[in-house]
Amino acid sequence: MKRLLYLLAILLAPIHVSAQMLFSENMTMSIDSTKTLQGTISPSLNFQTEKENVFTFRNSANINLLIKRSRVINLINKFEFSTYGKKVTLSGGYIHAEFRYLLDHAFEVYPFAESQWAASRGMAFKFSTGLQSRYRLVNSSTTLMFATLGLFYEYEEWERPMPAPNGPKYAYSHRIKSHLSLSMRNKIGEHWELTTTAIHQATPDTYLKKARFGGAVDLKYNITPSIGIRGAYRLIYDTDPIVDIRKDYNVVDAGLDISF
């Protein structure tokens, strides 16, 4: 009971975002059918000496609730807060939820919803919801591969980098988009795991001209079955951003994974 309350506290906390894509495919590759409640948490702590001492704590959570072996509720989030002297600052974040239906041993469909706010690069708020399907292409002792296809609604609110003196401060976007992705996880020896994902998103009428592409690479070293060290790289390339920003966005991160 204490563990469940702790996990709920993580999920309900304010959360941090890094980009337009959450790459949830990299975090939902496999489910242990012997566990009802399972997942990972990834805490990190940063300290800097500026005019005041600055502590920054980040934590991400990926929680799966298995229902009768054929349904999964998946919740993913991330939050961050900092202390600057005696002042505590809560940053933006995201939350992603999906309800996965296993229709066949290799095929599943799932409605999903996600929200992001106070993101980097000026994205003030984003909400998306839709329906996706996923088919398992490869399932061996060392390799797992999925192809995902879906359709979703996306609302975005961006702060303009240099608004006109009397012009609007924010730009808005309402779009229906398609989602296509390919994800693969490889076990390398006894301790290493490599997970990669490639994503294409676009509106039906601008499938190639104004697409958004994404790539993710996670490399994990499992110290024990429950504790690992993860390094991650994320790339987003938006061919037609709604405000004047760089088209490419890159993130490199590292942290500790604690599984249960």
Each model region followed by its residue ranges:
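Residue-level signature of outer-membrane beta-barrel architecture
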Residues: L45-F47, L65, Y101, Y135-L137, ...
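Transmembrane beta-barrel strands of outer-membrane/channel proteins
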Residues: I41-F47, L75-F81, P111-S115, L131, ...
